[in-house]
Amino acid sequence: MIQYTSTGKKSYTQCVFLEKEGADYRVSKSFGEMLKNEEFYKSLEEIVEFGISRYKENYSRRYQDTDLVLYQKYTYEDACRLLKWEHNEVPLNIGGYKYDKKTKTFPVFINYDKQEDISDTTKYEDHFTSYNRLIAISKSGRSIESEDVQNFLKAKERGIDVQLFVRKNKDDKISKEFYYLGRMMPTGMAKEFVMPNTNKTAVEIEWALDTPVREDIYKYIVNG
């Protein structure tokens, strides 16, 4: 059974539209009474129609065999759900990337612009070198032989699906979501190094994106 929890769930705990009835559900008594109001019913109908229209326009053209749409924006929770993970993961547990053994999916989440006041062990110099090439850094304290790094480098032979999500800045006031940029595979270029001002090692990996980043999004992310 897939289970998800979020702050959004807490916000809407008082909005009960359905109630459990045996093995099925029925419209809640309070919501049923509201539906008798013609003005409310019409407004609700318009909202539902708008939602369906927006879905068809923005989310119906799925990327390859995924439930994701290229260049649309997703939260961590959205990504976990659409990649069919059994449980949602909080951002702290993901920490830039996380491998799900059951689905063999390995989403990578990149904050392109790093804050100046973060610790040296989290100042990863992830950067695009072209529209379809990315240099990404592993978590600190990793070597070439680390399991997560090996899963990246041997993704093809292990059947691991690496997916890329990028946002310009984690404190972006406009959106807390990541642009979905599709699948990527390692080019074979990887090197271990010691992170500046620390004694921690990390691994730099070059990636080839399956689909080059759309020009307007690329310029928005890369340009300061």
State where each predicted segment sits.
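Short linear sequence elements within intrinsically disordered, low-complexity coil regions
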Residues: 9, 17, 22, 30, ...
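Catalytic cores and motor modules of nucleic-acid processing enzymes
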Residues: 1-92, 98-101
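Compact mixed alphabeta submodule
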Residues: 171-224
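Residue-identity detector for glycine
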Residues: 8, 22, 32, 51, ...
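Compositionally biased, low-complexity repeat tracts
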Residues: 4, 28, 137, 178, ...
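Acidic, glycine-rich low-complexity segments with interspersed aromatic residues
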Residues: 68-177
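Short, structured coil/loop segments at alpha-helix boundaries
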Residues: 5, 9, 24, 28, ...
